[in-house]
UniProtKB/Swiss-Prot annotation:
Source organism superkingdom: Bacteria
Pfam families membership: H2O2_YaaD
Name of the protein in question: UPF0246 protein SG0407
InterPro entries named among the record's database cross-references: YaaA
GO cellular component, one term: cytosol
UniProt GO BP: response to hydroperoxide
Family note: Belongs to the UPF0246 family.
Organism the protein comes from: Sodalis glossinidius (strain morsitans)
Length: 259
């Protein structure tokens, strides 16, 4: 079973580390080439391209300039501990045991606009470069063109190393599009999390992101290996709804929360 999740814009390079072990990103040369492109962008262009404030644009221009290899524990941090958005709140990797980090390293992959695909213990330096932005590059008009089949190849490699053919897609559509799902050597199951609001069930972004992290955590901490085991997932009050699900899109619903 291979879990795929999105990165986060919110980063944490300050908190104490839950593990000292680390690995190097597998697509670092491609990341370095992207950094060379990004260093040519003015803060004003970054602001327009990413739809962010001047202050954030200045920060990310500085990050592009400061980015350097080799990555070491002194200038970089393990990806699973560096990302701190809603998904990662649900994942709570800072509480993992070493055995759980081992399981995650084999079974979890994080997609990234800059790094392509990251294993949990891969070091990364701070950045902001979302997969969906229109950054012209030698391969085409966007990062989807840039990464091409590389991300799919890496996921297929991870599946082959496991001897498995199951991908659990807990990433956003923006990021999973970069994977080219039709090229995956296996079955892709997409869990969908719906919250009741005023008598109707709908995707509430903040809640859905956190739920993706909670399901990732469940798979890792329980060392799940079979898809049917996922149907018992009940963290946060979600319950599997067989009637609303299809073969490869599994729906989990939660009753309206008080407050």
């Amino acid at each position: 079973m291979l879990i795929v999740i999105s990165p986060a814009k919110t980063l944490d390079f300050q908190s104490p580390l839950a593990t000292r072990r680390y690995t190097q990103p597998e697509l670092l040369p491609q990341s370095a080439a992207l950094i060379d492109l990004c260093r040519k962008l003015t803060p004003a262009r970054i602001s327009t391209l990413m739809g962010i404030s001047d202050k954030l644009a200045d920060l990310n221009a500085a990050r592009f300039q400061a980015w350097q290899t080799p990555f070491t524990p002194d200038n970089a941090r393990q990806a699973i501990l560096a990302f701190k958005g809603d998904v990662y709140t649900g994942l709570a990797a800072e509480t993992f045991s070493e055995a759980q980090f081992d399981f995650a390293q084999r079974h979890l992959r994080m997609l990234s606009g800059l790094y392509g695909v990251l294993r949990p213990l891969d070091l990364m330096q701070p950045y902001r470069l979302e997969m969906g932005i229109r950054l012209a590059n030698p391969a085409g008009a966007s990062l989807y063109h840039y990464w091409g089949t590389m991300l799919t190849d890496k996921l297929n490699q991870a599946l082959a190393e496991q001897g498995d053919t199951l991908v659990i897609n807990l990433a956003s559509d923006e990021y999973f599009r970069a994977v080219q799902p039709a090229r995956i050597n296996g079955r892709v199951i997409k869990p969908v999390f719906l919250d009741e609001k005023n008598g109707q069930y709908k995707v509430i972004s903040f809640n859905a992101k956190k739920a993706r992290g909670m399901m990732s955590r469940c798979i890792i901490t329980e060392a799940l290996t079979q898809p049917e085991q996922l149907k018992a997932f009940d963290a946060g009050g979600y319950r599997f709804d067989a009637a609303a699900s299809s073969d490869n899109e599994w729906v989990f619903k939660r009753l309206q929360q008080d407050g």
